[in-house]
Amino acid sequence: MPDRPLPKNLQRSLKVSTVDEMWYKLLIEGNVRWRQGRHLFGMLPSNPRCVNCHRPFAGIGGTLLRVIQGTHKSDKNPRFCAACHSFTSQYPGGAEIELTMLFVDVRGSTTIAEKMNDSEFSRLMNRFYEATISVLVQADAFIDKLVGDEVTALFIPGFAGKEHARRAVEAG
């Protein structure tokens, strides 16, 4: 798909002219469009907040934004709001960037599964998923997928920071 121009209001606020330029800026610097609202959202009471735009998730500020804007946590990383995440779906595209991908799996899971009944193994895997996702989310990774005994996470510079590779190693 050829690169497309962004609407003029986004060109002015993001200081880029095309969708691919926006994606590059987003993936390297973070979701800059919503950062313009950080000051306003920061004045609303209540933590926890979206680490990107500072929208509150709880308390009176969170309730107010849920009612007015439908704000909720992202499915890919609950430290970010769905608005920051869904903004990108309005402008499909991408950019070639350096990022870190982490695969976490259960060593010997087949052998373990053979020694347990199905429900015990299912509970074990659910505990693995919960613990792993909790650590990865705290490191600002985006959970890409859960497959069998594996969790795949993306450490994107615009969200995990310039030290994304180090953060992935420390989280893993």
Please tell me what each predicted stretch does.
Residues 1-98, 111:
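Regulatory cytosolic signal-relay segments
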Residues 92-170:
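Catalytic NTP-binding/metal-coordinating core of nucleotidyl cyclase/transferase enzymes
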